Design a protein with these regions (language model features):
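Acidic (Asp/Glu-rich) sequence patches and key acidic residues
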Residues: 1-157
């Protein structure tokens, strides 16, 4: 499922990163290409079929204003991007065990992201959460054609 969204801070708040710190974090993600004008492309050839997200980072007064993202991705990539935007380094805290997502979410999972950011769905013109977007994405894009029952991440409780 392709997405076209913008990640914004919650009203009255700021995203915790500077343009430069986000550029550094995104530059460390395999397959991510970040340009100094704020544009980025993330291609994951390990996903089947290959997924690609294109985006643009907008900043104002030394802080991130919002990030626009378009393309196709899986839920793990979406979480990785949201975590970077919100200042959380390292891999996502979700781990798969025996084909099922573990029930616990670490403090830097969606619960922490949603205390910092909200998501604007551009085409639909409404606001939602990062976890709601993730619930609409496959765990791996190859699961779009898979008979596996696990094709989506569960929403945190």
């Amino acid at each position: 499922m392709p997405i076209f969204v913008q990640i914004h801070p919650l009203p009255g708040q700021q995203l915790p990163q500077s343009f430069e710190s986000l550029a550094e974090m995104l530059g460390n993600i395999p397959g991510m290409f970040f340009e100094l004008d704020g544009s980025f492309v993330w291609v994951d050839h390990e996903d089947t079929p290959s997924s690609q997200m294109d985006g643009m980072v907008y900043d104002r007064l030394g802080k991130l204003a919002y990030i626009e993202v378009k393309g196709a991705c899986n839920a793990r990539q979406w979480l990785t991007l949201c975590r970077a935007v919100c200042g959380f380094a390292g891999p996502p805290p979700l781990a798969l065990k025996n084909g099922e997502a573990e029930s616990g979410y670490a403090a830097s999972g969606y619960d922490a992201i949603e205390r910092i950011a909200r998501v604007h769905r551009v085409v639909e013109g409404d606001w939602t959460t990062a976890s709601e977007i993730a619930s609409q994405l496959p765990l791996h894009r190859q699961s779009l054609n898979s008979s596996s029952t696990l094709s989506r991440l569960p929403r945190p409780s």
